[in-house]
């Protein structure tokens, strides 16, 4: 929509420039803008065009985000007396100038120190869950900026499914560590349904047809029962009108005569 509005604005400008007299444009060229020369209200048109723009949701800052002033672990161990180094060198060796990979590595180490008993063991289930959580949050930040990136979206969904699998295994083996991991990472684990059946179009159409047939059969049953009740009522009325023994009715007629 912004592109269409910008094209309409440029076409109106071109029409106004072609219709305006040449001397007047030359005289005003040094003193006014192109929008003022054409007599257009540029701010109003731009505001109308900006109204069509979709505002991207702002990603909330995470609590486990490391401070930008922290030093990278490798440089901190190599260089002695890090505090006495120049400020420019400190900034270069800090997370402010670090790559994305190094930031994710430090995030994972911080979470591992909170959760795992042995932070250096990356083969345990809780360590794998921490690594997948850091990766998922990185994918979510990327998807906030690039919504149409299908490759990262697929990797995000695959990582979420894998984390669900590891959480289920950890819940079955060590429930205390599972609770601690979910609490520290801020993850909510939902139990899967007992009976899962993938819904297809054919199944939905068949189910709708069965429901429709059942409703029609119930209607026919009600109509049949109503007809039977009406026939029974008519037969009862007929029996009440006609006497059972006609011989009992003859003496009454003779008495009346």
UniProtKB/Swiss-Prot annotation:
Database matches in InterPro entries: Ribosomal_uS15, Ribosomal_uS15_bac-type, uS15_NS1_RNA-bd_sf, uS15_ribosomal
Gene Ontology MF terms: structural constituent of ribosome
GO term, biological process aspect, one: translation
Alphabetized CDD domains for the sequence: Ribosomal_S15p_S13e
Subcellular location(s) per record: Mitochondrion matrix
Biased composition (Basic and acidic residues): 234-243
Any single GO CC term annotated in Swiss-Prot or TrEMBL for this entry: mitochondrial ribosome
HAMAP family the record matches: Ribosomal_uS15_B
Assembly description: Component of the mitochondrial ribosome small subunit (28S) which comprises a 12S rRNA and about 30 distinct proteins. Interacts with METTL17.
Recorded family membership: Belongs to the universal ribosomal protein uS15 family.
Name this polypeptide is given: Small ribosomal subunit protein uS15m
Organism of origin: Rattus norvegicus (Rat)
Source taxonomy: Eukaryota, Metazoa, Chordata, Craniata, Vertebrata
């Amino acid at each position: 929509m912004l592109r269409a509005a910008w094209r309409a604005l440029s076409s109106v400008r071109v029409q106004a420039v072609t219709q305006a007299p040449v001397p007047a444009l030359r005289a005003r060229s040094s003193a006014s803008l192109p929008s003022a020369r054409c007599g257009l209200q540029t701010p109003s048109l731009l505001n109308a065009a900006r109204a069509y723009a979709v505002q991207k949701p702002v990603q909330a800052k995470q609590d486990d985000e490391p401070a930008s002033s922290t030093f990278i672990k490798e440089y901190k161990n190599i260089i002695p007396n890090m505090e006495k180094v120049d400020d420019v060198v400190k900034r270069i060796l800090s997370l402010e100038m670090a790559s994305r990979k190094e930031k994710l590595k430090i995030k994972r180490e911080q979470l591992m120190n909170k959760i795992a008993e042995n932070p250096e063991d990356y083969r345990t289930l809780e360590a794998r869950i921490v690594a997948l959580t850091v990766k998922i949050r990185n994918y979510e930040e990327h998807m906030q900026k690039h919504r149409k990136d299908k490759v990262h979206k697929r990797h995000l969904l695959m990582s979420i499914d894998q984390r669900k699998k590891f959480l289920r295994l950890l819940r079955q083996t060590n429930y205390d560590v599972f609770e601690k991991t979910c609490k520290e990472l801020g993850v909510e684990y939902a139990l899967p349904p007992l009976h899962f059946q993938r819904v297809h179009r054919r199944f939905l159409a068949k189910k709708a047809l069965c429901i429709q047939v059942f409703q029609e059969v119930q209607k026919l049953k009600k109509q049949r029962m109503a007809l039977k009740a009406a026939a029974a009522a008519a037969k009862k009325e007929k029996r009440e009108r006609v006497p059972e023994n006609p011989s009992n009715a003859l003496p009454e007629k003779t008495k009346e005569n």
